[in-house]
A protein has these predicted regions:
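Cys/His-clustered metal-coordination modules, chiefly Zn-binding fingers
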Residues: 79-130
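Long, charged N-terminal interaction/targeting segments
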Residues: 1-82
Length: 130
């Protein structure tokens, strides 16, 4: 008898994102961390209509647990999405950069002094930029 392959368990957020575009408003979810292994921040915004600016924007942080594995943060994100009646969810499939914000946490145009991993690295591919 052939063994059944077990599918990797997906989070409710991953399931929503896999459904694809279902109209506006769209919730966008992006993960950030000091490297490409641990997400210490997640930012979720609502894009109300095509061409509109993302508003509102909410951020969650964790110093001790990867935010992708934190069930409390996951539930709060789902509640945020429901509250703003998002029909679609778009989520990056990886950590896309440093959790610190340019012009807020460090000067514009400079590299974050706390997250050297992301210095000179393309945040979408993870490749080092020469």
């Amino acid at each position: 008898m052939a063994k059944k392959l077990r599918r990797r368990s997906r989070s409710p957020l991953e399931k929503k994102a896999r459904r694809g575009f279902r109209g506006y408003p769209v919730a966008t979810i992006a993960f950030y961390g000091p490297n490409d292994e641990i997400a210490s921040k997640v930012a979720v915004s609502i894009v109300p209509a095509e061409g509109a600016e993302a508003d509102p924007l909410e951020r969650w942080f964790s110093d001790d647990l990867d935010v992708r594995r934190d069930s409390t943060i996951g539930e709060e994100i789902l509640a945020f999405i429901r509250r703003h009646e998002a029909k679609s969810v778009v989520m990056a499939d990886r950590i896309i950069g440093c959790p610190h914000e340019e012009k807020i946490d460090y000067p514009e145009g400079e590299v974050c002094p706390e997250c050297r991993f992301w210095a000179h690295r393309d945040r979408w591919s993870g490749d080092i930029i020469h």
